Amino acid sequence: SPGAAHADRGANTAALRALARIVTFNPAGDTLGVTQGFFVEANGTLIAPYAPFRGATRALVSDSRSRQGHVLRIVAANAELDLLRATTDLARRNDEYLPLSPEQFPVGTAFTLVPFAADGRPAAQMANVVQTESLHGHNYYTLSAANAAALAGLPLLTAEAKPRVAAIAQFNYGKAPSDGTPLGLCALAASAADTLRTNAVAALSPDLTALRIPLLLPTDESEAYTYLYMLLRSRRDSSIVATALADFLAAHPNHREATLDAARFYAARRNYLRADSLLARALRISPDADSRSRVHEERAGLIIDALVVDSLHLPPHWRTAEALRALDRADSLAPHPSSALLRGVILYGQGRNREAFTAFERVNRSDAASLRSFFFAAQALSRAGGNDSAVVALLDSALAHTPTPFTAEAAAPLAWRAVYAERLGDQRRAVLDLVDYERLVPAAELAAPFFLRRAALAEQARLYRRAVDDYTTAAARTADRETRIEALTPKALLCVRLSAGDEALAAAEELQRLTPDTPDALKLLGLSHQLLGHRAQARRYLSQAAAKGDANAAELLRKVK
């Protein structure tokens, strides 16, 4: 009837007003993709295909009235569903957006498809559901409408006076039937688009990580901060994080932790004046002396970090003296062990070792005592000329504050304790510490000198099997001739002392190849053969060594029967 036809035209016109054309751009400003979608909220939120947004840094939007705007924030995205929800700056009137239907429609349902029309008038098409499948709990339809990439992203409408979006058109990538029947267009139930909501877990989504347009934070403050926290620790695209920080602080200006996060973020990117401004803001919004103390301590830490990586480009006031003044202010408000630890690190870096030791000892007397604080104290006391036994006691405490079996952070204290154990004459302790040390560091970092040193200590400690093994490893870890000789000579001699004839002979033969017919090599060959009962070879090699002037070989020769 004329009335029904008029109603259909009105519905189609409303649908057309909700459509959006979208152009995405890469970082160089080149067009990355062109697609279409539709508005679903009065604030300009739209639904569109995901694929054209992958890698895009910005997107332009235009509607059926040729008004232009920008995609502002990505709300949520799902690459598998090829759907994305985003906000724009094109606010809509009540007749310029479409509600989503939660329903799953059966085979035979008729939808209306309203694409853009060249003359601005709606050109509606009918599309019947000919097949349904399930995709993550949502109907996935095959339609009677012809398959066309140009239709992807368009809404399929319910047959109602005030139509709702029943499904979103998607290109059918399947194979055409063998009987020549053309492929029908596909569509995903609109209920899938309604699941695209921002939440804290989404911050780690690889689908969102692949997008470079800023992300919309959750409205709840706690959930939004969790989202921001995860972005700060997972995102490499600093522009995304900077926008998220700005959005969060605009919505929650008195959030102290986020303000400190922002200060750290900008300090790490060498924007020190911005970091200082944020730290000053954090001070203003800190509710008590303890939290203000933490801000001063944070500033000191940022200054020291910056001095390490960017000392040539810092503001004049970002210097070590200012960091110490910040710690003074922190301590005057509420002293913390962490502040004392940082003070000790700064003083140690200045060569003020006694003062550094005092600061570290303050930490060690607190519940915050740790491997680091005791190890730092040991280093400071050592540089200050402290007693060796006192240094070892601190190293013992450091290692007592690490889990057993030891983890990688115990490697440095173990190496230090081995040095002091050797100095104090406790070679056995030194060897055991170096055995633990070897387990904690990558094999590539352990060269021949390490094993030579441990072998010599093991020999002094009468840990002979360890010594032989370490001499063997030292020889295997180097191509340098002199180092191999340095390892094989004591190995062969020790094996002779241990009556390990086969090992002694193998080492002596390798030594002979490296230093042909030298007295040491010849003598060790003779002794090795003597151990194995090879009297003729023993006499021959010892005779050759004696002939070359080795008096000890001559004496040994007289004992060979």
Predicted regions: what is each one?
Residues D8-N12, A167-L232:
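C-terminal cap/linker of serine protease catalytic domains
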Residues E41-A123, H136-Y140, A149:
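Conserved active-site neighborhood of the chymotrypsin/trypsin-like protease fold
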Residues A15-A28, D89-E96, R121-R197:
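Active-site region of chymotrypsin-like
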Residues G3-F39, T45-P49, R58, L216, ...:
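N-terminal activation segment of mature serine protease catalytic domains
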Residues E257, S291-R294, H336-S338, R372, ...:
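Start-of-helix register in tetratricopeptide repeats
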Residues A268, D305-V309, G349-Q350, R383-A384, ...:
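Register position in tetratricopeptide repeats
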